[in-house]
Swiss-Prot record:
Pfam families assigned: Xol-1_GHMP-like, Xol-1_N
Record-stated family: Belongs to the GHMP kinase family. Xol-1 subfamily.
InterPro entries: GHMP_kinase_C_sf (IPR036554), Ribosomal_Su5_D2-typ_SF (IPR020568), Ribsml_uS5_D2-typ_fold_subgr (IPR014721), Xol-1_GHMP-like (IPR015193), Xol-1_N (IPR015192)
Bias (Basic and acidic residues): 405-415
Chain residue ranges for the region called Disordered: 390-426
Official protein name in the record: XO lethal protein 1 homolog
Superkingdom of origin: Eukaryota
Species annotation: Caenorhabditis briggsae
Length: 426
């Protein structure tokens, strides 16, 4: 047998590592002089392009006074962000915000935790966290000091930034879920909410029933990228009609909500206007291959930067078998053999944006996550084994070599076959 025509099969070992962490990144090596104020803003996750929910993952803005002088322009403020690839947010949205706030001093602002679960910088969370971090510095100097003061009235801030050029397809709903009292609430996408221009008109759905019945987990892999992919937000259905079905399933929690997420994903991936990326096809096929009759997986939704999975309440912390089931199916569909790690994050409801104080941790859930690492095992083919007589054992009366008698096909035992093919005896 010619082994060169058959590449060795690749098997995998799966290693699961579970951990937990605080929802707010701690300051490490922060020895800068002077008082500092920290503002936090929750990131959000959407479901089926209809519902926006704040989650227990936060962007943090740490602000110090750089100069007591009134800035001549927004360019005087110093903005520090680790992700230099997104310098446009510093030059654009952040500068616009600092200009419109009409600040009385020059500040140094450090941004951390800016990436959401999709892996992208959340422009909304960054701006809201900055606003919250400036409040205690600026509020005593704000001469309006009335009920519409931008430092004490979230609706005034919302009205100022709602027309900014955010990348988000549902920017107003994301703003609402990030700024306002948002715990245990779903915010409507603005396509379903005509009153959203007025923040008092925000309509929400309670998420208490869904969160009591299910674990929602955001999953990504080393193959996912934060690059924006429009096909994941393509929607040819009537969004309002779909939203009516979503509302019904939220009010009466059962597995229909999870099944509706799968159907919505199927419609997204089936788009012919913009072909889905390889990682989208890989995860979609792999998740469908998981036998939901033998798994804790109830439903899933393909998203930008990853996918959501739905489990019965408590399964995430109690077991990890379902993680291995998902990992094994993704590996089976990975033609590139490039899948190395899969990251699982249990979603908990987030708190509203505010100025950070240490006692807030008492009211926050820990973040629970897990990583499945894939270790490749290359299975080598066995070397061919030759059977038969050696030259020393050949009989003295050797038969003539001409006109050999054809071998009877039925007479092919191990003792007289030329080679032993291990693959044929599996």
């Amino acid at each position: 047998m010619d082994k060169t025509n058959f590449p060795p099969p690749i098997n995998h070992d799966f290693h699961v590592h579970k951990s937990s962490s605080l929802p707010i990144e701690e300051d490490v090596g922060d020895n800068a002089p002077g008082p500092k104020i920290v503002g936090i803003a929750p990131h959000v996750v959407d479901k089926m392009g209809s519902l926006i929910m704040a989650v227990n993952k936060y962007c943090k803005a740490t602000t110090r006074v750089e100069s007591p002088s009134k800035p001549r322009s927004a360019e005087e403020h110093i903005i520090e962000m680790a992700d230099s690839f997104h310098g446009d947010i510093r030059r654009g949205l952040i500068r616009n915000l600092l200009r419109d706030l009409e600040l009385t001093r020059v500040y140094r602002i450090q941004i951390t935790g800016e990436h959401d679960y999709n892996g992208r910088i959340s422009q909304t969370a960054v701006l809201v966290a900055i606003w919250r971090s400036l409040k205690s510095f600026e509020h005593p100097y704000d001469r309006t000091f009335g009920e519409d003061c931008i430092w004490s009235n979230a609706e005034t801030f919302y009205a100022m930034v709602k027309d900014y050029n955010f990348e988000s397809a549902a920017k107003l709903s994301v703003l609402g879920a990030t700024i306002f009292d948002n715990e245990l609430k779903y915010f409507y996408d603005e396509k379903m909410d005509e009153d959203i221009q007025n923040p008092k008109g925000f309509r929400t759905l309670s998420s208490v029933g869904m969160l009591a019945e299910y674990d929602f987990v955001f999953v990504s892999t080393n193959l996912h990228t934060p690059k924006y992919t429009p096909e994941l937000f393509w929607d040819k259905e009537n969004p309002k009609a779909r939203f009516e079905r979503v509302k019904e399933n939220v009010h009466y929690p059962d597995d229909n909500f999870a099944h509706q997420m799968v159907y919505f994903s199927d419609r997204r991936v089936a788009s012919t206007s913009i072909p889905p990326s390889p990682i989208v096809k890989l995860t979609h096929q792999g998740l469908h291959a998981v036998n939901r009759n033998e798994s804790d997986l109830i439903g899933f939704e393909i998203q930008q930067g990853g996918f959501l999975v739905v489990l019965k309440k408590g399964v995430f912390l109690a077991d990890h078998t379902w993680m291995i089931q998902i990992a094994s199916k993704l590996v089976e569909n990975d033609e590139s053999n490039s899948l190395e790690e899969i990251y699982f994050h249990l979603l908990e409801p987030g708190k509203r944006s505010e100025e950070w104080k240490p006692n807030l941790l008492k009211y926050m859930d820990e973040n629970h996550h897990a990583t499945v690492s894939l270790k490749k095992k290359t299975v080598q083919f066995a070397e061919p084994i030759f059977f038969g007589l050696t030259s020393e054992e050949e009989p003295k009366n050797k038969p003539p070599s001409h006109n050999p008698k054809p071998r009877d096909p039925a007479d092919r035992s191990l003792s007289n076959d030329d080679t032993f093919d291990t693959a044929s005896t599996s």
